[in-house]
UniProtKB/Swiss-Prot annotation:
Its main location: cytoplasm. Its EC number is 5.3.1.9. GO terms for molecular function: carbohydrate derivative binding; glucose-6-phosphate isomerase activity; monosaccharide binding. This is Glucose-6-phosphate isomerase 1. It is found in: Cytoplasm. It catalyses: alpha-D-glucose 6-phosphate = beta-D-fructose 6-phosphate. GO terms for cellular component: cytosol. Catalyzes the reversible isomerization of glucose-6-phosphate to fructose-6-phosphate.
């Protein structure tokens, strides 16, 4: 048995879960007219309503006791102080230091992190302004018009999600494109309409050895030099973001064109660093600073707010309750704002790569449910795709509904229609409709008894489906920064409670190693006899069918 399961709060939550499974949220709302006020958190720029979950005051108190018994506040202090809480890699976890709004020295292992970050930001600002103002010239002397960000995972998904969410702030000084897939179809499609003499590539890789990224970067260099007929043109068209400056220089990128990363920043938490260069180039450095400021706002709230009023902590506790104690196996992220169309994919990586593990930080096998699988889609699209499953499947899927009060493009009538669906869905998922109501409705519509008997069971919705509602006042850089940081801290709190190291990704590394071996076999046409018969047969079929 895990040490977590011996905690008094854990045992109480197990008992409460058995009791709550027989309750309905409709009853809880009927019994307490103050339920929304008790189970919601309002910040200056956003609101969290978690009242549509199968909880009451006793449950919340037990969840808060669990956070106390698992020392969430102590671990939070350790993270912000720069202690090495990434146990398996012996590293500090300091993505929050990238958005500190202070000049105060922050010394980690003899290095002033504040100074490093401020110097990096200053270098980024100079570079961004030079490119956006047309002073950075390509090999032919023409200004840069297009940026191609080459990366994968955290080096791609975070920046792309943000630039998509905030594209209404872009003034068109440059056009930003992203390449992440090693399938050559993507880079070929991105490069096809571009003019080599006007393109600047950002190669983002912490190690500068990531196979997918380096393959795409080599293709980009070949594309450029075949047009310029000059290998020296690389210096004017390539910059790198990496923690491995030597590898980047060996690749051909000049030292002055290399921006630093640090080992205390994980890839999926790195958009606040120079990994976010594409964001700043697209939106302007001032908007990038607003993004950082919004994340810092949430950092301060996370540090200072009591856990019962703490936006990220409550998100984490509700997720632990729904997954570990009530048994939900997945969670939907459902943005009702077109600008957030990549948010689900971003949060899928952030949460599942962080906490999708089954071994505790002590090395013991975990025998309780940890992170749910994260999935979803833009809300309106989802309504016509998988909401049937959310409403009537025998699997209960908790969902986060995320919307904004003000639309970035206020086309008359559209936002009200969108938000009417937003509010209706959370109510419908909770309230449902019983068979008595269905029969009465069908009878009122003049249906005969035979029809009612046949159809009524199919129209029953049990309801009692848990949801969180997050409402931002608008989608702007500062509010988006706060939202992203809230989910980052949610993931951290989940990891602490579940006794998981949230900042490594060994499952990713295993596949990388095997892929490298198989790639060699495919290139040499020499399939190893060490594979299982399925893999060996697939490789042989692939080779013979080429």
């Amino acid at each position: 048995m895990s040490s977590r399961q011996t905690l008094a709060s854990w045992k109480k939550l197990q008992l409460l879960a058995q009791d709550k499974k027989s309750q309905h949220m409709n009853t809880l709302f009927a019994q307490d007219s103050e339920r929304f006020n008790k189970f919601s958190i309002e910040l200056p720029n956003m609101l969290l309503d978690y009242s549509k979950n199968l909880i009451d005051t006793e449950t919340l108190d037990a969840l808060l006791a669990l956070a106390e018994e698992t020392q969430v506040c102590d671990w939070r202090a350790k993270m912000f102080a720069g202690e090495k809480i990434n146990k398996t890699e012996d590293r500090a976890v300091l993505h929050t230091a990238l958005r500190r709004q202070s000049d105060e020295a922050f010394i980690i292992e003899g290095e002033n992190v504040t100074e490093h970050v401020k110097n990096q930001l200053a270098e980024m600002e100079v570079f961004v302004n030079k490119v956006r103002q047309g002073h950075w010239l390509g090999y032919s002397g023409k200004r840069i018009t297009d940026i191609v960000n080459i990366g994968v995972g955290g080096s791609n998904l975070g920046p792309q999600m943000v630039t998509e969410a905030l594209k209404h702030y872009s003034d068109g000084s440059v056009n930003v494109h992203y390449v992440s897939n090693v399938d050559g179809a993507q880079i070929a499609e991105v490069l096809r309409p571009l003019e080599p003499e006007k393109v600047l590539f950002i190669v983002s890789s912490k190690t500068f050895t990531t196979t997918e990224t380096m393959t795409n970067a080599r293709t980009a260099i070949n594309w450029l030099t075949s047009a310029s007929f000059d290998e020296n043109s690389v210096a004017k068209h390539f910059v790198a973001v990496t923690a491995n400056k030597e590898n980047a220089m060996s690749f051909g990128i000049e030292e002055q064109n290399i921006f630093d990363m640090w080992d205390w920043v994980g890839g999926r938490f790195s958009l606040w660093s120079a990994i976010g260069l594409a964001i700043a180039l697209d939106l302007g450095f001032d908007k990038f600073e607003e993004l950082l400021a919004g994340a810092h706002d949430m950092d301060q709230h996370f540090i200072n707010a009591p856990l019962k009023d703490n936006f990220p902590a409550i998100l984490a506790l509700i997720s632990v309750w729904n997954t570990t104690f009530l048994g939900s196996q997945s969670q939907a992220i459902l943005p009702y704002d077109q600008t957030l169309h990549m948010l689900t994919a971003y949060l899928q990586q952030a949460e599942m790569e962080s906490n999708g593990k089954s071994v505790s930080w002590d090395g013991d096998e975990i025998d309780y449910a940890t992170v749910p699988s994260i999935w979803g889609e833009l809300g309106i699209n989802g309504q016509h795709a998988f909401y049937q499953y959310l409403h009537q499947s025998n699997n209960v899927v908790p969902a986060d509904f995320i919307g904004s009060v003000k639309s970035v493009t206020p086309v008359k009538g559209h936002h009200e229609t969108l938000m009417a669906n937003f509010f209706a869905q959370t109510q419908a998922l909770m309230v449902g409709v019983n068979e008595e109501q269905v029969r009465a409705d069908l009878k009122a519509k003049g249906r005969n008894a035979e029809y009612i008997d046949n159809v009524a069971p199919h129209k029953v919705h049990k309801g009692n489906r848990p949801t969180n509602t997050i409402l931002l006042k608008c989608i702007n850089p500062r509010n988006l920064g706060s939202l992203i940081a809230a989910y980052e801290h949610k993931i951290f709190v989940q990891g602490i409670i579940l006794q998981i190291c949230s900042f490594d990704q060994w499952g990713v590394e295993l596949g990388k190693g095997l892929a490298a071996e198989i790639q060699t076999e495919l290139q040499t046409d020499n399939i190893s006899a060490q594979h299982d018969c399925s893999t060996s047969s697939l490789l042989k079929f692939y080779q013979s069918a080429k």
